[in-house]
Swiss-Prot record:
This is Voltage-dependent calcium channel subunit alpha-2/delta-1. The chain crosses the membrane at residues 1074-1094. GO terms for molecular function: metal ion binding; voltage-gated calcium channel activity. Residues 1095-1103 are cytoplasmic. The keyword Calcium applies.
Length: 1103
């Protein structure tokens, strides 16, 4: 009872301190503070409304309704038309694939194998030839073509349509009999390549990837420009590309079983670790995998206790775990295989439900574990592949028997150089049932999104397997061949798909997106992977092709729809329905992350979706309520067109304001430029020469930009220019859907930093989703211009109703001078007379902090000079204890989101971080041990070095220097996290006491009506030391969500509808095993280890 009375007394005293009416109290009353805030709000809104001319622009749109019509955005109709267009595009590409595959099978069947070729008999263009033809030599039996290249805008590189190009992996000798035969028969594909292009000039890369590693692609283009990337080792192998892996075999359920007994130690253990990592790289997102180790007992190597999807994050977890395994104990194959079969046959978890495989990596042993195979695999539905790793004297018989008796294959990995080739050849075995199935397996598949190796940017690839249809005769019976020749592929750029989903009538917050059966997006405005390599840009990739390419681009860009947006239950439902191929529509309120990823807004969105027939993709259209209609200009009179276009000329900037035009594809012949002045000149010159209705132009786009140019010019001429200079206003601006940005006066426009593409302007998109005036501080940059130079931006969407239809065609605003605002701010919040030291917001007060924050928690105004120098900075870095308390009392809510498309400096990412879209990234520890780069590169050099003893000059293109090695690791894929803060409720006032242990700080806050601002008055942090741990909003490296938890509740997905994993006609007697290493190979291995020792030693010295 006494405690209750004490609590009541304490609360009463606190309330009297905070809201007591007497001017004698130490803290201003809530009524007083609200009166200050109401005056600030009135002054700010009146200033913004008057200076921006928001009402005047509404009047202009209403006045000139005869110059435009209001057209509906019928979401269902739009999404179905776009889906049909995408279906047609992919169908045309599929026809090209079928023609190529049929011709390849026909030509190869007629090809006569030859052991010898006459000099210069095989003619081809080697894509890795130096651009200087004098530096190229042909191998015996072949002759090099020297194409004439031209720069091609479609590919963004040098192209020859007269020839195809051939890429041969570095570790394959191009003069070998196998390669010469492949070159010989695949040359017939060139005519089909050309015919396909004649029928469809929009075709991009057409590629045949051979099971031998040779890749023939059309049109011809140099693989690399050696002047840009000198002395770089080429590690590309077509058989490791995601599209080849997907096309070569049906999905896989793979259990990798690793022997960690005491005999597996030293170099053998290191070889196993690297082999398992390489094996994991042969898996795609349609596959499922886990890794287990065994000695006298068996266990999972990681936290995964069952098969998991072979996406990049999960494979990274497994690789990290494998790198930490140690060897001890004795080998018990029975325990290992029992564990593997139990897990592989567990159907209670998500899995591929197709090829079931056990991959055994061991140094050998005497046990066959026959009873285990009899128990679990009598019907041989599980294939067993065995790998004898390292140099040892064990009898290979037992582990070879395991493979042969279980429809698998036996491989030997005696050294580093054998890893890459032997960890990918199992795909040939898995391809047997597909070949035997014949036409049933001839189904075009479309891949996930990935970065094209030849710098085309983001692409998807249609694939079709190519079979060896040559008959084999045994006992006078014609047996079908079961060898896969390779995979045919045709690329489709995402830019081509985007062109079928026009965006410029949807408003900036409307967009299309598409997903595949894994739920990964192939089309989405937030699909912006950052290229990995030297000199990484600091912004997201927006161009068609990145400037940097790297072997890591082989990995698909797997961004889940629920990671591309802010997840909620309705979006989960939409994703599931899209994967199931259903059509539907949902309208709901959702959180929306801003373009600059600093803010979160709330808005109503309508999602409309439909399947893309003939594919596994599904397409959706997202529209806010204010984009159900759009403006279509009807500038039929050339006089009006000319008058409006005149306002875009730089000579008129003094009168019309500095003008920007969005860089869009207005006309085919109009070159887009990043230089606004240059682009405007080109645009005006083009319009002067050709009318907007020219067949090469998009008349709707041009007429809309001209309409907006005219309307915004009238705002400048008839309103802004007639106003006297308004104190505190540095600039006025108007931005439109049509792509016009006008900044007045001209001088202010010369320092304008916003994106001229209005559809990608963060403040513009935010203004559309908010009914209030949106205040935005410039980015805080210690070394760059601050708020004093650029001012505070205030923006408001122009809202009009035409015949009852809501439109938001533009945003107007001003930039406020910081000094003027400070003067008004302090004047408004000064109390006279002031009876105590804490009764008002005196400038640079020692005892009182007064700040204005925006809805994201960024500082916009303060009564302290050291604060105002930090305008634009997140308040959690300025006063972290207060910001934490504001979150705790629900003034602010927050959302933590992850970016799986980031790149980081090596070592910057957390140790256990999992990059969402990386290929295997070698760590420093890897380099110090064997090193992925060093192994692959060293083996390639050694192989070709020994070959060059017979064929001089072979090594000329494969030199490697320490600087190149270091530079290649300058960036790596990683996950970053960022936290966005937003107002959590509609409460306008709040008060409290911030308890800091030995002291406390009273505070009171008020939101400014019709704005996104909040005023806070608080006792200075200098008077009461508190928690100083910074609260970070900015992007920072992260482990991401715990993958061990994520696999327990995997997201819904669907695998391919068909599976080719077994066939009764399969001949599995060819199951591997060689007669041992001949002396020359032992010699190669000896030199290889010597080189690796030298590389390792020099690396230690460098580090």
């Amino acid at each position: 009872m006494a405690a209750g009375c004490l609590l009541a007394l304490t609360l009463t005293l606190f309330q009297s301190l905070l809201i007591g009416p007497s001017s004698e109290e130490p803290f201003p009353s809530a009524v007083t503070i609200k009166s200050w805030v109401d005056k600030m709000q009135e002054d700010l809104v009146t200033l913004a409304k008057t200076a921006s001319g928001v009402n005047q622009l509404v009047d202009i749109y209403e006045k000139y309704q005869d110059l435009y019509t209001v057209e509906p955005n019928n979401a269902r109709q739009l999404v179905e038309i776009a889906a049909r267009d995408i279906e047609k595009l992919l169908s045309n590409r599929s026809k090209a694939l079928v023609r190529l595959a049929l011709e390849a099978e026909k030509v190869q069947a007629a090809h006569q194998w030859r052991e010898d070729f006459a000099s210069n008999e095989v003619v081809y263009y080697n894509a890795k030839d130096d651009l200087d033809p004098e530096k190229n030599d042909s191998e015996p039996g072949s002759q090099r073509i020297k194409p004439v290249f031209i720069e091609d805008a479609n590919f963004g590189r040098q192209i020859s349509y007269q020839h195809a190009a051939v890429h041969i992996p570095t570790d394959i000798y191009e003069g070998s009999t196998i390669v010469l035969n492949e070159l010989n028969w695949t040359s017939a594909l060139d005519e089909v390549f050309k015919k396909n292009r004649e029928e469809d000039p929009s075709l991009l890369w057409q590629v045949f990837g051979s099971a031998t590693g040779l890749a023939r692609y059309y049109p011809a283009s140099p693989w690399v420009d050696n002047s840009r990337t000198p002395n770089k080792i080429d590690l590309y192998d077509v058989r490791r590309r995601p599209w080849y892996i997907q096309g070569a075999a049906s999905p896989k359920d793979m259990l990798i079983l690793v022997d960690v007994s005491g005999s597996v130690s030293g170099l053998t253990l290191k070889l196993i670790r690297t082999s398992v990592s390489e094996m994991l790289e042969t898996l795609s997102d349609d596959d499922f995998v886990n890794v287990a180790s065994f000695n006298s007992n068996a266990q999972d190597v990681s936290c995964f206790q069952h098969l998991v999807q072979a996406n990049v994050r999960n494979k990274k977890v497994l690789k990290d775990a494998v790198n930490n395994i140690t060897a001890k104990g004795i080998t018990d194959y029975k325990k290992g295989f029992s564990f593997a079969f139990e897990q592989l046959l567990n159907y209670n978890v998500s899995r591929a439900n197709c090829n079931k495989i056990i991959m055994l990596f061991t140094d050998g042993g005497e046990e066959r574990a026959q009873e285990i195979f009899n128990k679990y695999n009598k019907d041989k539905k599980v294939r067993v592949f065995t790998f004898s790793v390292g140099q040892h004297n064990y009898d290979r018989g037992p582990i070879q028997w395991m493979a042969c008796e279980n429809k698998g294959y036996y491989y030997e990995i005696p050294s580093i150089g054998a890893i890459r080739i032997n960890t990918q050849e199992y795909l040939d075995v898995l391809g047997r049932p597909m070949v035997l199935a014949g036409d049933k397996a001839k189904q075009v598949q479309w891949t996930n999104v990935y970065l094209d190796a030849l710098e085309l940017g983001l692409v998807i690839t249609g694939t079709l397997p190519v079979f060896n249809i040559t008959g084999q005769f045994e006992n006078k019976t014609n047996l079908k061949n079961q060898l896969i020749l390779g995979v045919m592929g045709v690329d489709v750029s995402l830019e081509d798909i985007k062109r079928l989903t026009p965006r410029f009538t949807l408003c900036p917050n409307g967009y299309y997106f598409a997903i595949d059966p894994n739920g990964y997006v192939l089309l989405h405005p937030n699909l912006q992977p950052k290229p990995i390599g030297v000199g990484i840009p600091t912004i997201n990739l927006r161009k068609r092709r990145p400037n940097i390419q790297n072997p890591k681009s082989q990995e698909p860009v797997t961004l889940d729809f629920l990671d591309a947006e802010l997840e909620n239950d309705i979006k989960v439902e939409i994703r599931n329905k899209m994967i199931d191929g259903e059509s539907g529509e949902k309208t709901f309120r959702t959180l929306v992350k801003s373009q600059d990823e600093r803010y979160i807004d709330k808005g109503n969105r309508t999602y409309t979706w439909t399947p893309v027939n003939g594919t596994d993709y599904s397409l959706a259209l997202v529209l806010p309520t204010y984009s159900f209609y759009y403006i279509k200009a009807k500038l039929e009179e050339t006089i009006t067109q000319a008058r409006y276009s005149e306002t875009l000329k730089p000579d008129n900037f003094e009168e019309s304001g500095y003008t920007f035009i969005a860089p869009r594809d207005y006309c085919n012949d109009l070159k887009i430029s990043d230089n606004n002045t240059e682009f405007l000149l080109n645009f005006n010159e083009f319009i002067d020469r050709k009318t907007p209705n020219n067949p090469s132009c998009n008349a709707d786009l041009i007429n809309r930009v001209l309409l907006d140019a005219g309307f915004t010019n009238e705002l400048v001429q008839n309103y802004w220019s007639k106003q006297k200079n308004i104190k505190g206003v540095k600039a006025r601006f108007v931005v439109t859907d049509g792509g016009i940005t006008r900044v007045y006066p001209k001088e202010a426009g010369e320092n304008w930093q916003e994106n001229p593409e209005t559809y990608e302007d963060s403040f513009y998109k935010r203004s559309l989703d908010n009914d209030n005036y949106v205040f935005t501080a410039p980015y805080f940059n210690k070394s760059g211009p601050g708020a004093y130079e650029s001012g505070i931006m205030v923006s408001k969407a122009v809202e009009i109703y035409i015949q009852g239809k809501l439109l938001k065609p533009a945003v107007v605003g001003i930039k406020i001078d910081v000094n003027s605002w400070i003067e008004n701010f302090t004047k408004t919040s000064i109390r006279d007379p002031c009876a105590g030291p804490v009764c008002d917001c005196k400038r640079n007060s020692d005892v009182m902090d007064c700040v204005i924050l925006d809805d994201g928690g960024f500082l916009l105004m303060a009564n302290h000079d050291d604060y105002t120098n930090q305008i634009g900075r997140f308040f959690g870095e300025i006063d972290p204890s207060l910001m934490r308390h504001l979150v705790n009392i629900s003034v602010y809510a927050f959302n933590k989101s992850y970016d799986y498309q980031s790149v980081c400096e090596p070592g910057a990412a957390p140790k256990q971080g999992a990059g969402h879209r990386s290929a295997y990234v070698p760590s420093v520890a890897d380099i110090l041990q064997i090193g992925w780069w060093a192994t692959a590169a060293a083996w390639s050099i050694l192989q070709q070095f020994l070959l060059s003893l017979t064929f001089p000059r072979l090594l000329e293109a494969v030199e490697m220097e320490d600087d190149d090695f270091t530079a290649s690791l300058s960036k790596q894929s990683c996950i970053t996290e960022q936290t966005q803060y937003f107002f959590d409720n509609d409460s306008k006032s709040f008060s409290g006491v911030l308890d800091c242990g030995n002291c406390s700080r009273i505070f009171h806050g008020e939101k400014l009506m019709n704005t996104n601002l909040i005023f806070i008055m608080v006792e200075s942090k200098g008077t009461c030391p508190c928690d100083t741990r910074l609260l970070i909003q900015a992007e920072q490296t992260s482990d991401g969500p715990n993958p061990c938890d994520m696999v327990k509740q995997p997201r819904y997905r669907k695998g391919p509808d068909v599976c080719f994993d077994n066939n009764v006609l399969e001949d599995y007697t060819d199951c591997g095993g060689v007669s041992g290493l001949n002396p020359s190979l032992w010699y190669i291995i000896g030199i290889q280890f010597l080189l690796l020792w030298l590389v390792s030693g020099s690396t230690h010295r460098l580090l």
